[in-house]
Amino acid sequence: EKLLLNMNSNKDKITSFTSFGNFDPSYLWTNEDMKLYPKENLKGKNILTITSSGDHALNAILNGGSMIDSFDVNQFSKYVSALKIAMIKKYDYYDFFKRMDWIENVESLNFNSRENIIDSVRKYLSHDEYLFWSTFEYLRINNKVHFNDVINVYGNLKKNVYSKALSYNKLKRNLKNAKITYYDSDIIDIEKNVNKKYDRVFLSNVLEYVLATNTPHFVDNYQKVISGLDKILLPGSVIYGYDFSNVSKYSDNISEHLSYKYDEASCKSCGVQQKIFSLSKV
């Protein structure tokens, strides 16, 4: 309850590196075209992802990843991610998307006003996760918080590879052997909070915020972030990012003492300039 009612302090908790806050509504779905990311076997890989909607971790698990560390400065993101994962574990393909469609359009966790989704998936939630969502529902019913204080229904489930039944069922199976560890952390601090090194890092468009323009202030922040990440990367590792504006020069602005190979793939069907890019450690 304290966490949920602490949202008004969000303005004091904006990170200095991006405009993200500790208590922002978390996306229900990704707004990236996840099909742009290369399909590779992630079995046995140490993986670090931004939490956000949870879809980067889910995509990694679909591709065989089982050891996922997930971080976000937004403390609501891990709860939204955990709820989606619990629902995937509980429901088959049709029932999952029927309930997600209800959540998205009706903005309620009481499906058809008869089924309390939180209670239905309780066995798949940790004690902390169940307590958060049951408290959220209590406060929402009593008009102390609003649905969109925590869940932002913006996004597009069709951009996820698990929107197809075959992929959904594979993801459901893979989740049985996967573990996600969540960290409440900004990108600049993540190297201080984890105790392992990674093969793959999926950052969504966080680096686009860090390197918002190619001016000295933003370039300095970007170099600090990449230098910090470099400390927790294994040889041959790859950082993946997403860019909605195609303004930032990710390769040109890396510190001279670091060696990374840059590559990118543009979205041909987005209607706007979007791309994924990779920084491969060499």
Predicted regions and their residues:
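Conserved beta-strand signature within the Rossmann-like core of class I S-adenosyl-L-methionine
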Residues: 236-243
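Conserved SAM-binding loop of SAM-dependent methyltransferases across substrates and taxa
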Residues: 54-65
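A short acidic, Gly/Pro-enriched loop at the edge of an enzyme's catalytic core
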Residues: 190-202
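S-adenosyl-L-methionine
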Residues: 2-43
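A short glycine-rich, Lys/Arg-flanked "PGG" loop and its adjoining helix->strand segment in the class I
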Residues: 216-235
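Class I S-adenosyl-L-methionine-dependent methyltransferase module
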Residues: 3-8, 20-21, 76-176
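Core SAM-dependent methyltransferase catalytic element
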Residues: 261-282
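Conserved class I S-adenosyl-L-methionine
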Residues: 44-52, 69
